Amino acid sequence: MENLIIEKLKKEDLKEAILIYDTNHNLTTNYDKLFKEYDKIYNNPDYHNIVAKLDNKIVGLATIVVNHDIVEELKPFLTVWNFGVHKDYRRKKIGTRMFNYIYEYAEKLECEFIALIAEKDNVIGQKFYESLGYYKQVGFVKLINKEKW
């Protein structure tokens, strides 16, 4: 995978990148709203959207959010959202390479930990995260103004 590049998501790559998440989760993103909100998201230093490109094709996506803690040592921590690899490119270490990028970013910021949520039915994702050293904790999610997943 020498041709694999992990980089910050660019506006011109939005549709291709978001399509991976939408396809993996059988969703439809509101692109009009996304394009209107993108500059606000892109310019927020606490948001870091990345893509994995293989031969200039987007094959992975992740949103990394810096959270600023107010207790103990006041170290920041990261949350990872919207993580996904295109189904045709899984089991090729692309997700692992993306997480290596995330680890380097966390170390640069001197983060205390990284948190993420895997949907309860996403057994493949859970096994992948466990293979990277993550362990299960109890987490809760409340959807606001939406139907249950």
Walk through the language-model features, giving the residues of each:
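Conserved GNAT-fold acetyl-CoA-binding loop/helix
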Residues: L19-K40
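Conserved active-site alpha-helix within GNAT-family acetyltransferase domains
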Residues: T96, K120-V138
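Conserved GNAT acetyl-CoA-binding A-motif
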Residues: F99, A106-I117
